[in-house]
């Protein structure tokens, strides 16, 4: 956060930093709790500023990690495709982290990575720092293959949700809290 504050001051743009105490998480996993707090705060700030969207820097590597974690938990199509929200825009979601870093280096853009990304205390970091190298050793093309799988499943999810929405509008009607199926 200090580096971000310095950067904002150096380049003269506004920044707001949320400081929270993880002791308030009621035993919930720190990473999950922090994500919920962060996204709730993004939503609150967007509403306060009258913003329709929040942009994040999630990239394809993040999506692969999310996919693998959700798949191993037994998630369904909606859960396994992850990171889907109307309000959140992820312009880098289809780019590999390496490509983003190459771009930053080529254009002399400063880059900082949170030191917690190396800590094996967090499940996501175990995927990133331990499982990913093994997958690369077993199948060097795994990143491209998993990217294609994620994109195919997202397309299937969107198609299925579209069909469900169309069916619902054609074959159901709402009466108070009841949903009635037309015969």
Language model region names:
Residues 117-125, 143-154:
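Internal, active-site/partner-interface "lid" segment
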Residues 110-112, 141-146, 160:
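Short, structured loop/turn "capping" segments at alpha-beta junctions
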Residues 20-24, 37, 85, 147-183:
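AMP-forming adenylation/ATP pyrophosphatase catalytic core
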Residues 129-146:
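Conserved anion/nucleotide-ligand pocket segment
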């Amino acid at each position: 956060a200090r580096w971000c504050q310095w950067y904002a001051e150096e380049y003269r743009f506004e920044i707001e930093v949320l400081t929270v105490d993880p002791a308030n998480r009621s035993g919930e996993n720190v990473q999950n709790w922090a994500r919920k707090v962060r996204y709730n705060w993004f939503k609150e700030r967007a509403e306060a500023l009258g913003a329709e969207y929040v942009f994040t820097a999630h990239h394809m590597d993040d999506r692969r990690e999310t996919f693998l974690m959700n798949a191993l938990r037994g998630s369904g199509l909606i859960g396994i495709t992850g990171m889907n929200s109307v309000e959140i825009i992820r312009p880098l979601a289809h780019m590999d982290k390496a490509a983003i870093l190459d771009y930053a280096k080529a254009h002399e853009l400063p880059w900082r990575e949170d030191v917690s990304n190396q800590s094996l205390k967090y499940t996501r970091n175990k995927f990133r720092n331990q499982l990913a190298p093994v997958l690369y050793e077993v199948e060097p093309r795994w990143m491209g293959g998993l990217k294609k799988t994620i994109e195919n499943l997202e397309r299937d999810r969107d198609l299925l949700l579209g069909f469900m929405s169309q069916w619902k509008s054609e074959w159901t009607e709402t009466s108070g809290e009841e949903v009635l199926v037309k015969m």
